[in-house]
Amino acid sequence: MADQQALLAWGAVGVPLALLGVLGVEVWLAANAEYLPDEPGYVLESRVAPASGAADGPEVRLVVLGDSTAAGVGAPTLAESLPVQVAQRLADDLGRPVDMTGLGVSGARTIDVRDEQIPMLVDRGVDAVLIVIGSNDVTHATSPSAMAEQTRGMLRAARRNAGEAAIVLGGIPLFGSADALAQPLRLLVDTYASVLRRVQRDTAAEEGVCFVNIAVEASPRFAGVPEAMSSDGFHPAPVGYGFWADALAPALAAELGS
């Protein structure tokens, strides 16, 4: 019933308002966001060792897929980006070096990860795949049925192309700290995000893939911490990405150890 009410609210006013509002936001973000280069073919690459300096065990090959959060938007340096922060925490948790490759693309939706990023896993010999996706599905009003189909296809393709690699799906965050979205747009976006987030969670469970609920495990930590958001008011800053990494890295470590 809650999902139906959310969909009715979104369908009545949310879709047209969101499409107009987000269009203006995206134009502004393009001119003001701080981010690492993301032109076609740009890849984030970093090899990190445990902070203790003592590495015991073989290198972990981690690939991070997804949207702007996986592409470095909001992070002035590579070391502060979400993929590298996750890799560093994973190295610390496992006591092993981590070789991280980030293939995220700003603006990507679930269907883009499925069709354009997942195929790049072939022959990479990866140990772990982290997918952080869904925010652009919210702002572009992907329907719940399409979200379920595309998420399922994405996870199955990841399983086929990544072999025995551990796979973790990071879910849609809360938009409560995204000051770039004025009210009531922010409320409408957050309402619809909750619908698609449940689709992600349920589909991941059906496919036997670990789901990390960023909205529950990380987003609440942004409250009262303005430095957690980047200057564009939409993407996390390094501090905020640290909150995300605190939730994502333990899940990867657990999957690698299972």
Question: Regions from the language model: what does each represent?
Answer:
Residues A162-A166:
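A short helix->loop->beta-strand "cap" motif at the edges of active sites that frequently abuts
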